[in-house]
């Protein structure tokens, strides 16, 4: 009964697949026959020789019968109609003719047999090559994710039923995860595959169908690298170092340094596109000349006319300090350390006036999804605004690397709690935090272990059994340690493991405060503070742009600030599922991924606004996470470049203010009049950091975060606006500048006061009154 059901299912599936999906693929319908023939070939060439012998034997018998019939006809009619008998000479001639013919048949038989052998060899080799090709295909896609989506058409092939049947057959060979809200499928083959399975070969044929798009999963990352200042060695350290530990992040905002643009206090912007500036804040704490006052004028046209270059600038020039190395600089209010810099007084986009105007109109909650490195969900300034949190890290490996110790998992620190007393006397119990009993390890033949420090265990990878180990406390000195005193190689491995794990425990203890949160990098937490920081500490905490923003956090990037396209697609699906109105996507790649474009198109159909950073660039070739080319017209970056074909993407560059008051593009910001819409402040912003810390940083990611917060602000005032209407309000509120005219599509930067005013005007009359 089971075989019959399987047979019926098999015929049904094959007919549908062959007739509907695989008109371009040969041999699928008769695949079973092809397999059977191949198996016959593999059994040996003898079977085919037997077939040849039978064939030519029948030919020979037919020839013999022809001869006999000819001999029987002794009489024949000549041309004149006379009857004449054949004599013996005629018989001899016929025999000779038959012998010649028989010899010719044998020669032809030998020739054909040789040709058949060659043909069989070719068929056999072709079969072997096909097997090797299938194995190679399987090896290439095994343990990898494939991104699948159906090509859009209006035929019956796009119906749910046929898609369901298609994916059901594929599911028999591997695991399928359906992303319902963006119409994608993530496909993975199992770790162990039977290469001889006919169904597997059919699945490979399925993946070659012209009805679907199949894309390999690829890695994508941010374009920035965070740094912190280390007071111990007076140099800049990468935050995402080998030990993934973050140092010199302040507990309180008042402990953060004031950033003054002088060559002696911080590095040029173009040197590091994404740098945390941690300096002594007391240097300018009492210097009132460093306080930049807000220009409250809304008449930008008058300001433009006062400038010979027709460029927008602030009139108060005396409050700036020139940056001697770059001839341009960012400014930071040095006295009030509240919130982001656009709230503190460095207010070139009139954020403070706009927020004051919007205060009584923000009535609607807005779901904002952040696809990034995660968030510190316990941060006091953020925890009340987080409504959803999800991690998609299918490719991440939980390893903890410390200077050559590569195989210690962060979730498993067992193995150093107990060392058997039979192997090493006097070292019965070793606690994880305290190793008593091995105070001094001396050796005559072990390099690098005279002094063992917790921060350096290089050089003790191998401890040989022939080495003599003397201990001043628990292992007595002797020339040869015999029996129970003898330390074997396995015991030495235990000692090595013990020392290695002790160092790991110390490093883990140092970093434990930073590993408790879901954001081990800090980038996602920093962005969340700009958008929706809502500190209960008042001026001592971070106040973000949109108080009504409800954060949906999706972690698609690991602690090294990198992730995979499939993880990002899962986050897109998660954001759509949770009904997000806005998605902040601060990542970029030089590679065009059709699946990423298709997913953004699905979000466009769902009226979801996507805010993307333009990307950071640097002329420094050593900066691996910054692009060498700043002009996106020359080197496209995605997803920013998709804005030319999609109308739900806003791409943002970073602006700074020169000492003369002019607003210009930051030298480390990517730009394009075709793919980047506008610019926003993103330099020296103070925001939240994991474990209730605060930090200062710069980059286009934070410019995009400012626009994300403003989009949330607009929707909190008028939730009935569509994404296109929000974009039109942004375009209407742009301050045109000559310096940005050929840098961004809209030719300027946003004015928040005008944006809020236009949004309030868009409200229905009854609500406005």
UniProtKB/Swiss-Prot annotation:
Glycosylated residues in this chain: 68, 102, 108, 295, 316, 356, 482, 515, 584, 616, 720
InterPro entries according to UniProt: Peptidase_S8/S53_dom, Peptidase_S8/S53_dom_sf, Peptidase_S8/S53_subtilisin, Peptidase_S8_Asp-AS, Peptidase_S8_His-AS, Peptidase_S8_subtilisin-rel
PROSITE patterns, A to Z: SUBTILASE, SUBTILASE_ASP, SUBTILASE_HIS
Chief place of localization: secreted
Keyword Hydrolase: yes
Cellular component annotations (GO), alphabetically ordered: extracellular space
Start-end of Low complexity biased regions: 303-325
Alphabetized Pfam families for the sequence: Peptidase_S8 (PF00082)
Record field: compositional bias (Basic residues): 293-302
Gene Ontology biological process terms, A to Z: protein processing; proteolysis
Keyword RNA-binding attached: no
Keywords (A to Z) from UniProt: Glycoprotein, Hydrolase, Protease, Secreted, Serine protease, Signal, Zymogen
Enzyme Commission code: 3.4.21.62
Active-site residue numbers: 372, 523, 701
One Gene Ontology molecular-function label: serine-type endopeptidase activity
Ranges for region Disordered: 293-329, 468-493
Compartments where found: Secreted
Lineage top rank: taxon: Eukaryota
Reactions catalysed according to its record: Hydrolysis of proteins with broad specificity for peptide bonds, and a preference for a large uncharged residue in P1. Hydrolyzes peptide amides
Domain Peptidase S8: from-to ranges: 345-756
Matches recorded under PANTHER family: CELL WALL-ASSOCIATED PROTEASE, SUBTILISIN-RELATED
Family classification: Belongs to the peptidase S8 family.
Function: Serine protease which may cleave PFN/profilin.
Name recorded for this polypeptide: Subtilisin-like protease 3
Organism of origin: Plasmodium falciparum (isolate 3D7)
Gene it is expressed from: SUB3
């Amino acid at each position: 009964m089971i075989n019959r059901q399987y047979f019926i299912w098999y015929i049904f599936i094959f007919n549908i697949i062959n007739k509907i999906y695989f008109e371009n693929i040969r041999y699928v319908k008769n695949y079973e026959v092809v397999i059977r023939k191949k198996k016959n070939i593999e059994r040996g060439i003898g079977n085919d020789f037997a077939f040849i012998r039978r064939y030519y034997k029948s030919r020979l018998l037919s020839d013999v019968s022809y001869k006999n019939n000819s001999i029987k006809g002794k009489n024949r009619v000549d041309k004149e109609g006379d009857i004449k008998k054949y004599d013996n000479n005629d018989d001899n001639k016929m025999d000779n003719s038959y012998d010649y013919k028989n010899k010719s048949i044998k020669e032809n038989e030998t020739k054909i047999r040789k040709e058949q052998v060659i043909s069989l060899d070719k068929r056999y080799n072709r079969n072997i090559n096909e097997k090797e090709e299938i194995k190679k295909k399987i090896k290439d896609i095994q343990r990898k994710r494939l991104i699948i989506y159906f090509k859009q058409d209006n035929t019956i092939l796009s119906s749910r039923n046929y898609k369901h049947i298609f994916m059901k057959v594929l599911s028999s060979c591997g695991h399928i995860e359906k992303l319902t809200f963006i119409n994608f499928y993530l496909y993975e083959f199992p770790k162990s595959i039977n290469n001889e399975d006919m169904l597997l070969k059919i699945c490979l044929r399925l993946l070659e169908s012209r009805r679907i798009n199949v894309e390999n999963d690829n890695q994508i990352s941010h374009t920035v690298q965070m740094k912190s200042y280390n007071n111990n060695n007076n140099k800049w350290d990468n935050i995402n170092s080998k030990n993934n530990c973050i140092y010199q992040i302040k507990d309180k905002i008042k402990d953060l340094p004031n950033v003054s643009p002088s060559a002696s206090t911080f590095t040029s912007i173009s040197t590091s596109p994404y740098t945390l500036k941690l300096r002594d804040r007391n240097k300018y704490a009492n210097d009132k000349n460093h306080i930049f006052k807000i220009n409250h004028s809304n008449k930008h046209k008058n300001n433009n006319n006062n400038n010979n270059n027709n460029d927008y600038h602030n009139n108060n020039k005396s409050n700036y300090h020139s940056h001697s190395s770059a001839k341009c600089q960012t400014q930071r209010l040095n006295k009030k350390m509240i919130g982001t810099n656009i709230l503190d007084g460095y207010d070139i986009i009139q954020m403070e006036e706009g927020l004051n105007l919007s205060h009584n109109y923000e009535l609607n909650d807005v779901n904002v999804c952040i696809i990034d490195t995660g968030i510190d969900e316990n941060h006091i300034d953020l925890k009340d605004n987080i409504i959803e949190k999800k991690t998609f890290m299918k490719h991440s490996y939980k390893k903890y690397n410390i200077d050559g110790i590569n195989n210690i998992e962060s979730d498993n620190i067992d193995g150093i709690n107990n060392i058997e007393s039979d192997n090493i006397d006097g070292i019965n119990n070793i606690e994880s935090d305290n190793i008593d009993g091995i105070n001094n390890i001396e050796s005559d033949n072990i390099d690098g272990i005279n002094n063992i420090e917790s921060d350096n265990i290089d050089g003790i990878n191998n401890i040989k059994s022939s080495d003599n180990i003397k201990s001043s406390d628990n292992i007595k000195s002797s020339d040869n340690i015999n029996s129970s005193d003898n330390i074997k190689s396995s015991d030495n491995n235990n000692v090595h493991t013990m020392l290695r794990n002790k160092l790991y425990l110390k490093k883990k203890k140092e970093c434990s405060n930073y590993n408790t949160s879901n954001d081990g990098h800090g980038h996602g937490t920093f962005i969340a503070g700009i958008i929706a920081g809502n500190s209960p500490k008042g001026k001592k905490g971070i106040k973000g742009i949109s108080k009504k923003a409800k954060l949906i956090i999706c972690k698609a990037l690991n602690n090294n600030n990198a992730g995979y396209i499939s993880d990002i697609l899962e986050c897109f699906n998660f954001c759509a599922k949770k009904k997000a109105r806005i998605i902040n996507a601060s990542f970029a790649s030089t590679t065009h991924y059709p699946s990423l474009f298709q997913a953004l198109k699905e979000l466009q159909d769902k009226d979801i606004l996507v805010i993307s950073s333009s990307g950071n660039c640097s002329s420094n070739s050593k900066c691996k996470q910054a692009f060498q080319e700043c002009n996106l017209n020359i080197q496209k970056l995605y997803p920013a470049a998709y804005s030319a074909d999609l109308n739900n993407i806003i791409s943002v560059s970073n602006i700074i203010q020169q000492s003369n008051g002019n607003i210009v593009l930051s030298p480390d910001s990517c730009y394009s009049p075709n793919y980047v819409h506008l610019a926003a402040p993103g330099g020296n912003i103070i925001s939240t950091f994991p474990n209730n810390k605060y930090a200062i940083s710069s980059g286009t990611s934070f410019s995009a975060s400012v626009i994300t917060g403003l989009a949330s602000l607009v929707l909190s005032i008028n939730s009935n606006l569509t994404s296109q209407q929000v974009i039109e309000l942004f375009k209407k509120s742009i301050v045109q500048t000559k310096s940005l005219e050929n840098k961004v599509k809209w030719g300027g930067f946003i004015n928040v006061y005008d944006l809020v005013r236009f949004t309030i005007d868009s409200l229905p009359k009854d609500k406005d009154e």
